[in-house]
Amino acid sequence: ETDGNANVTMKNVANLEGEVYKTTNRIIQRQRMKDELNILFPEVAKQYETDLDNHIIYTHDEASTPVLKQYCMAVSLYPLLTEGVGNIDGVTPSEPNDLQSFSGQITNLIFLLSSQCKGAVAVGEYFIALNYYVVKEFGDKWYEKLDCEASSPHCLIKRTVRDNILKAFKQFVWGVNQPAGNRSYQSPFTNISYYDHTYFTSLFGEFCYPDGSKPEWIAIDTLQRMFMKWFNQIRLKQVLTFPVETFAMVHNGDDIIDLNYKQLCAEMYAEGHSFFTYISDSADSLASCC
């Protein structure tokens, strides 16, 4: 029998391995919590298990692991730009040096981190980091030459700048939707964020890349719009759960400040895209999925 929360559509030996220990995991996790409650709140310790059994309270991922893990994590991608994932996986020799290696290493990073938590891994700087490598390959103001050919005369497949960016999108999306052995054959839960101009200025106005350059709003805006449009079209053809998207906007009490992004948000919902919207009166907070 498969756990209703297991996110699997068919049984195989990989997800069976994950399911078979869930009863034991649940007993261990529940006893750990009861032991702690007996120390902190002995008067309610006995009630804890009764309330769980009667679905009055809920404990997240109680059966997924016998050890205590945090639920979700949001991570900065800056160490990825400067060090790569070698300090985690012990294999990758250096930081990413082009668009393709960045797409590979960010996928590896998400898999590595997801094995150390029960929930999601949020990479809110995905488009900021991606732009760093787009600029490295295609130069400043790459967004003005999206339809320029960017492959050598010796290449049989001719690709434009736009094609290469879409290729990076595909590598990232196909990667994070792959089943993971360490997650009982589930994909690693992955979150990304889109920012309106107000959010971008507040969060990244003073941000510098490792080479001292700064991200341009027009470049980030172009990447975000390209990804949203492309991802929505791909989802019409196949089920792709990840990344889960959050669209962040700032309001002034009367309306969204960045009216262009208010319009984009409405357009994407009208086109059937599925994403979360987070609206705040200040860019000092951020939501990813939850």
Which ranges hold each PLM region?
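Conserved catalytic cores of very large enzyme subunits
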Residues: T2-C290
